[in-house]
Regions:
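N-terminus-centered regions that define maturation/targeting leaders and the start
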Residues: 1-209
Length: 209
């Protein structure tokens, strides 16, 4: 959709960004627990550029994700993917997955897609910023500079119930006070310029250390 936006408009909005401080994982007062989840992807390194097949310039599939051991006491996992560099008031939600069983250690390529009211194992793919279920492929304006796509994975214990197809607000309310551990992975994408770290990436990495 935004690939047709003239490059000069994207360049004009270069400094208009939601901000990394508005990511879910940076929510004021959100207790992230005492442990870290080791989140990674076999398709790209942390902080590296997305292969095009995961974006609006390619097949638009969700990338594969893997993570390490989940702390004892966690009874579910929840994932949200946000773009804090979107030219908007708030980060754009690219994916939301609720109720991942704690025994799982991966989401394969293309796994984040619409699932109606959810799966029989309790997981449910929620709404992205376009109000549709599934993976919203990265589609940054040409000339706007690199965008971070921040994968935030939470191990939860006793999280409250959410309705079918939860959105970001439902997600934040449900995880608050129930996080055992958290992990983060950043992929980048841009149009019309060389791949480079976005303005907020250094600060984001510092907060995750």
């Amino acid at each position: 959709m935004l690939e047709h936006l003239p490059r000069w408009i994207g360049a004009l909005m270069h400094n208009v960004r939601a901000g990394h401080s508005k990511l879910v994982i940076a929510e004021p007062g959100l207790d992230l627990g005492q442990m870290t989840l080791d989140l990674s992807s076999p398709a790209f390194a942390n902080g590296a550029r997305f292969p095009a097949r995961f974006t609006a310039d390619g097949e638009g599939l969700s990338p594969p994700l893997v993570w390490g051991d989940v702390p004892a006491g966690a009874d579910s996992l929840a994932l949200i993917v946000e773009d804090p560099d979107a030219p908007a008031l708030n980060p754009m939600v690219h994916a939301l997955v609720w109720g991942i069983p704690p025994s799982e250690r991966a989401l394969p390529e293309g796994a984040i897609r619409g699932d109606g009211a959810g799966s029989s194992d309790g997981r449910d793919v929620g709404r992205n910023s376009m109000l549709s279920e599934g993976w919203l492929p990265p589609d940054p304006p040409s000339g706007h500079g690199p965008h971070d796509y921040v994968f935030q994975l939470f191990a939860l214990s006793g999280a409250r119930e959410v309705g079918p197809n939860p959105g970001r607000l439902d997600f934040v309310r449900a995880i608050s006070g129930h996080i055992v551990a958290a992990g983060m992975l950043v992929g980048t994408y841009s149009r019309g310029e060389p791949a480079a770290a976005s303005p907020g990436q250094a600060a984001l990495r510092g907060n995750a250390a």
